Amino acid sequence: MSIKQYKLYLIDLDGTIYNGDKKIEYAKEFVDYLNANNIDYLFLTNNSTRQPKEVAEHLENFDIDTSEEHVFTSSDATKIYLEGKGYKNLYVIGESGLKNTLSSFNQKENEDCVDAVVVGLD
């Protein structure tokens, strides 16, 4: 297999590695190639319902051998953004993946007296 060498591959998931519950042809071979050749990559997803470990486990359903260190979710991006802004108190609407990723913040039960409202679901 001849693949142009880059320092890093940023790879979307749904529609690129899998399509819903279907494997995408050659996705496994591509990731296997990256792993075998020690090429850095990061799976990106706008799905906030799972944490990176859960995403890596989900990829096993498609025979993709990876780890949570190779997954970056929209929840991760949200956490970094909120930390950079210095926000502490959040009202979070979403699934456990989002809420768990943001667990270092004070999550309030209602939107009164919060710095930010975070909504995520996919």
Description of each model-found segment:
Residues 1-13, 17-122:
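HAD-like aspartate-dependent phosphatase fold
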